[in-house]
């Protein structure tokens, strides 16, 4: 999308895009080229040793730039969420794998009634140019496990392209950013935490088809085995918390857990596909370019 860029500043509510990054100086121009005009961009730098911050300031002069307080994607997102002031928060990656041009579709899903707009590479026309056979198999298994335990209908649990209303941050309840000591939730498991906790709260989740591209420059920090095990451990923690119905402390040994909310999850898909959950509400949303530009 090198021509017309959608201007979301002309609409309400206000939109903040949070972008965690570390050593992504070469990729940021591609991200900026496809970024719609939004009310606020929050750049979270993870101690980059290249020109990431300099390039970000040049591309987005008005961006809020913060340094994350620990390591890991989860901590970076928590720092970005804390700095965000928009009504809607959109989380994307800085490596070019998530397409900023899709942001209007996520925002539209929220303004049409969703609490969480969940990107999906495996339904509603979504696709991935990057996922390996091992990651696809692991994602499918983790999807099935979460859907059975929490009575949800996720098609793509581990994809990090999401948008949600900022008012739901207390439900997500990520670890505090005030300490430098490592916390459970600081890593790639953050995406599972967000999805499961919002589902457990009985909020409306709409899946939006998304195209994942290959990283443009550099190498991914994702490790399919170790990060997959962290996600599996997160699912078990949330399952135990659901049974106990109580909140634990934020620490590596005892993760922060939300209180249990007795409500059925509503997982809706924008294309009207079956979710596999009998009580789930299916919402159809028009995500054509003309519609999302309105």
Summary of predicted features, one role per range:
Residues 69-71, 75-83, 101-184, 215-222, ...:
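Acceptor/aglycone-binding surface of glycosyltransferases and processive sugar-polymer synthases
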Residues 32, 38-48, 66-67:
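Short beta-strand/loop segment that forms part of the nucleotide-sugar
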